[in-house]
Amino acid sequence: MGIAGKTLNRIGRFYRQNIVKVQYPMLTSLSRRILKKEGTLGVVYMLHHICEKDAKLIPTNEDLKVSPAFLEEIILKYKKLGFDFVSLDQLNEMICSGVPNRRPFVAFTIDDGYLDNYTNALPVFEKYDVPFTIFVATDFIDKKAILWWDCVEELTMTHESVTTSDGKTYPCQTFQQRWNTFRYLRERILNLDQNCLEQGLNDMFARYDIDWYGPIKEKGMTWSQVEELADLPLCTIGGHTVSHPSLKKISPEEAEQEIREGIERIAQFIKQPVRYFAYPYGTPHEIGEREFRIIERLGIQLAFMAHQGCITVDNMKHVTRLPRVYLKE
């Protein structure tokens, strides 16, 4: 066995022996199986909100949150084990050169562009000198994003039941009922026409007076904050489309436009090329070969899914569909 093979096996053994201990609350059974394979090189974490959780709210939304203290704990555990913290530029260099990192690595990525990325996550990453990437959906920054998941959650929290325009009524009196109702409504919303989402939502919830743009006015970053982050050595800004659509639900031309215009708008503000991308929602239900070809055509160097998995010798070659691990507190 050559030096490279010995290095990969050493890294694989290190991961199998240590990473499950570090991540024991967060790893799914799928992640555990992946980590047992030879050739595991590193893990790219996916986060959304860095803020305190609220046990009274819908778990589907709360699972997108990790507290600053928890993020700090994860960083400290990896530091203690001797893992390297890498930027996406460093990961890209590994992939392009074909030379893996000599030690297991961790990369942190955050999706969407929430304000708490700036107020809560940045201080933690700066404290420990850890690089990170924020994948920005530009409508979040332009305050045009419809955070329907927050609006629907509020609806379930403030009504004993929710009745949609087709006459179906969903109970909301208990915690479990609210959660079930949210999940049912979520599936229906994801199947709406993404090109006229607001109209579809208004039609579905015609009985209620909902300000679909209310949440983003409070929860989104500003362009000046994005620019400030982009100027920091630790932070990379990546693309995440314009409006965060389910890409499979729109035409090929519209999907390419969403990806391209999002990247161009970010580049316009940060005065830097945008080389990396994360797919909205990011599972095989929302993306496929068509989207991978668009990424290749646009010259994006690395694109990330929400699919659970670590970076391995095999999948690191597929730069349009790299997996991530969902960091869950």
Give residue spans per PLM region.
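Intrinsic-disorder-associated interaction segments
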Residues: 1-4, 8, 12-13, 20, ...
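C-terminal active-site subregion of NodB/CE4 polysaccharide deacetylases
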Residues: 2-108, 116, 147, 153, ...
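Metal-dependent polysaccharide deacetylase catalytic core of the NodB/CE4 family, i.e.
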Residues: 45, 50-51, 103-106, 126-285, ...
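Short, well-structured alpha-helical interface segments that form or flank functional binding sites
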Residues: 73, 116, 120, 221-224
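Solvent-exposed, non-membrane alpha-helical residues enriched in polar/charged side chains
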Residues: 76, 111, 122, 226-227
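A broadly conserved amphipathic alpha-helix scaffold signal in soluble, globular proteins
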Residues: 76, 119-126, 202
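Conserved beta-strand->loop/alpha-helix structural units within folded catalytic cores of enzymes
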Residues: 111-113, 118, 128-133
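A short acidic, amphipathic alpha-helical/loop segment
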Residues: 120-124, 225, 290-294
